[in-house]
Swiss-Prot record:
Function in brief: One of the primary rRNA binding proteins, it binds directly to 16S rRNA central domain where it helps coordinate assembly of the platform of the 30S subunit.
A GO term from the CC aspect: cytosolic small ribosomal subunit
Presence of keyword Membrane: no
A GO biological process held by the record: translation
Pfam family, one: Ribosomal_S8
Entry's family note: Belongs to the universal ribosomal protein uS8 family.
Self-association state and partner proteins as the record states: Part of the 30S ribosomal subunit.
Origin: domain of life: Archaea
GO molecular function, one term: rRNA binding
NCBIfam families to which the protein is assigned, alphabetical: PRK04034.1
PROSITE patterns referenced in this protein's UniProt entry, alphabetically: RIBOSOMAL_S8 (PS00053)
Organism: Korarchaeum cryptofilum (strain OPF8)
Protein name (database record): Small ribosomal subunit protein uS8
Record keywords, A-Z: Ribonucleoprotein, Ribosomal protein, RNA-binding, rRNA-binding
Length: 130
């Protein structure tokens, strides 16, 4: 079976695993984008650690959860955002100010919306987590 959106599957796996109280989940399809998103989540304390496992097909990520994820999802369609427009999207996707993060793909890599604001660059919204 083909997966239409591996990032959406990964984010829903993280949300479901955290809601069920699991300590470890397996993301069945690995990609560079999923790896970069997991790295951002680890830097901000939403997951403990993750490991890439090569299974000879697509690869997998084994993620250790710490229970801090309440909701994680993708933003579709992937909206292009300028530097001054992040606050509008924060109100839509995050529950409160300074709670959670929006993950942005920029020309300088994948980062949070706060890092993009500090650097003064825009990008494309790809996911959120709180």
């Amino acid at each position: 079976m083909t997966r239409l959106d591996p990032l959406a599957d990964a984010m829903s796996t993280l949300t479901n695993g955290s809601m069920l109280g699991k300590r470890e989940v397996v993301i069945n399809i690995a990609s560079k984008l999923i790896g970069k998103v997991l790295k951002v989540l680890k830097e901000h304390g939403y997951i403990d650690e993750f490991e890439y496992v090569d299974d000879g097909r697509f690869g997998k990520y084994v993620v250790r959860l710490n229970g801090r994820i309440n909701k994680a999802g993708v933003i579709k369609p992937r909206f292009p955002v300028k530097v001054g427009e992040f606050s509008r999207w924060e109100k839509i996707y995050l529950p409160a100010e300074n709670v959670g993060l929006i993950i942005v793909s920029t020309n300088q890599g994948v980062m949070t919306h706060r890092e993009a604001k500090e650097r003064g660059i825009g990008g494309v919204l790809i996911a959120y987590c709180y």
